[in-house]
Amino acid sequence: MVYVPGAEFRMGRDEKDGGDEFERPAHQVTVKPFFIDQFEVTCEDYAKFVKETGHRAPPSWMNGNYSEGAARKPVTAVTWDDASAYAKWAGKRLPTEEEWEFAARGTDGRRYPWGNDWKAGLANADGTSNSIADVGAYNGTTPFSAHDMVGNAWEWTASNLRAYPGGRLPGNQPGGELKVIRGGSYESTKEYATTTYRTGWPARGAKTYDQTGFRCVKDVSQ
């Protein structure tokens, strides 16, 4: 895990800066210090949890086992409840979307973890590859040295999808409780694989999304 100091930062992106309805308006948020996983939870990590607890394996795994060569790839096709159960087992929790965004961009309002301009080859997105990659395979780290916070796999957060203060959400959202997912995947374009783009995915039920994984956070002991 890597340490993220507490700070006030400007969350979201205004329309004049290219923000869409999900991202705007930009607003001030304060987060307390925390630790965040340097990498997304891998198939290898998740398999230990499945073996120890008897929790169901992702439906994409054959006979409860991940495919050959996938040990260091992010675990995907997990529901929000699956991700939450893993986090609890690991003595951690899922990040709020405020924590996730701050860990991805820091205090200077950057659009990508490395700066404001897209740079090909720093993240697994925008046509870089046609498949998910091992964690840490790309060097586009955040100000706090976390890897893969844009591209590769979407990431669950603890937060419900809600409009930002003074904003609104598009009217075509699926029904049910939606949890915020962040970061985009290897199939995302550079417009969506950003530190600010957000969307929601149903939290409950057996439906999974094969490009969504997660990472965990841990509170700093006081």
Language model: regions and residue ranges:
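Short, surface-exposed beta-strand/loop micro-motifs that present aromatic residues
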Residues: 27-28, 37, 143-145, 205
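Functional-site microenvironments in short loops/helix caps that host divalent-cation chemistry
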Residues: 4, 8-10, 14-16, 56, ...
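Short, compositionally biased
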Residues: 1-56, 80-81, 211-222
